[in-house]
Amino acid sequence: MSAEARKTETIPEWKQEEIDELVAFLERYESVGVVDITGIPSRQLQDMRRDLHGTAALRVSRNTLMERALNEGGDGLGELVEHVEGQVGLIGTNDNPFGLYQQLEESKTPAPINAGEVAPNDIVIPEGDTGVDPGPFVGDLQQVGANARIEGGSIKVVEDSTVLSAGEEVSSDLSNVLSELGIEPKEVGLDLRGVSSEGVLFSPEELDIDVESYRTDIESAASAARNLSVNAEYPTARTAPSMLAKAAGEAKSVGLSAAVESPDLADDLVSKADAQVRALAAQIDDEEALPEELQDVEQPAAADSAAEADDEDDTGNVEQTDESDADDADDADDADDADEEDGDGGDALGDMFG
C-alpha cells in the first residue's frame, strides 16, 4: 500500500467529507481566491456573505483542509496554498479576477480602531467643532496630539492634527478619543491575497488598476492600429469598409479632376462647371456677364463642395486654373470692348457661355 493511500486512510471521515465539499466548491467557479478575514466580527462576516450572494461565494474552513482541497483541485489552484495563513477563507466567482477585486474593494466599510491595533494609514483629527461641551475631553485631545481648545462654549480642533502615523500602534487613549469623535480610521472587508483563474495566479497589486484609464488606453491603441492598417493599405475585416470608402472617394476626385463623363459624377460635374462659370463672371466688370438663364438661379450648394474637393485632390493644378481663369477674363474683356462697339454685348456673351 502506498504512503499516499495510508495517509488518506488516517484522515477522519468528517475531514474527508469537508475536503470533498471544498473541492466541489472550487470546481464550481472560474476564479478562486484566498481572502483575509482577520478582525472581521462574525456578524459583519455574515453581512458580507449576504452582499456577495449572486456574484461570489465565501467558504471558511480549517487551513489544513483548505490546503488539501487546493492541492487536489488542480488547474494551478495549488499555488494559492502559500496564501493560506492566519484567518483566511476561500472565495469563488464566475467573474474575472479584476471584477472580483473591484467588488471586494467597493464592499469595504469604515470601522473604529481598537487599542493595540496597527494604524493602516495616518490618523488625522480634522479641524472643526467637535460638538463636545467644555470639560476634560479637551485635555484628552491635547494629550493625543490634537491642537484643541475651548471656543464659544464648545471644544474645537483649530487645525488638522495628525495624531498617529501609518504602521504605529493605537493606544488606549487615542482609541477612546477617536470613538468619542466618531472617527473610523480603518476599513473592514475581505482583503484578497491572491486569485487563480484558468491556471494563472494574480496578486492584488496586479489587479489594482484604474479601469477607466485602462479602457481609454485600449481604445486609443485600437484606434491607432486601425489608422495604421488603413494608411498602410492593409485590409482586415474591420478596416476593409473604410478602405473601400476611401478608395471610392479618391476615384471620384480623380473623375472630377479629369472631367470623366459618368452617371455617378454628372451632378458634381455640372455643379463644378456652374461654380467655374460664376467665378469667371465675377471677375468681369459687367452685370450682364453671367448668362441670363443663370442670373435668377441660386448657386447649388453642391457647387462649393465639388469645387473644394477638386481643390484638395488636385492642388497641383491650382495655379494653372487661376492663370486659365485670368486669361479667360482677359479674353472676355476684349470681347466686351468689341461688342460695345457693335452695340450687342449681351448677345456676344450669350454666345460665349451658351
UniProtKB/Swiss-Prot annotation:
Q: Where does this protein have compositionally biased stretches of type Acidic residues?
A: 286-296, 307-345
The record's region (Disordered) falls at 286-354
**Gene Ontology molecular function:** large ribosomal subunit rRNA binding; structural constituent of ribosome
Instruction: Give the GO terms filed under biological process for this record.
Output: cytoplasmic translation; ribosomal large subunit assembly
Task: Give the GO cellular component terms, alphabetically.
Answer: cytosolic large ribosomal subunit
Q: Which UniProt keywords apply?
A: Ribonucleoprotein, Ribosomal protein, RNA-binding, rRNA-binding
Q: Write down the Gene3D superfamilies for this protein, in alphabetical order.
A: 3.30.70.1730, 3.90.105.20, 6.10.140.760
Sorted alphabetically, which NCBIfam families does this protein's record hold?
PRK04019.1-4 (NF003097), PRK04019.1-5 (NF003098)
Share what the entry says about its subunit structure, partners included: Part of the 50S ribosomal subunit. Forms part of the ribosomal stalk which helps the ribosome interact with GTP-bound translation factors. Forms a heptameric L10(L12)2(L12)2(L12)2 complex, where L10 forms an elongated spine to which the L12 dimers bind in a sequential fashion.
Name the protein family: Belongs to the universal ribosomal protein uL10 family.
Role description: Forms part of the ribosomal stalk, playing a central role in the interaction of the ribosome with GTP-bound translation factors.
Name of the featured protein: Large ribosomal subunit protein uL10
Organism listed in the record: Natronomonas pharaonis (strain ATCC 35678 / DSM 2160 / CIP 103997 / JCM 8858 / NBRC 14720 / NCIMB 2260 / Gabara)
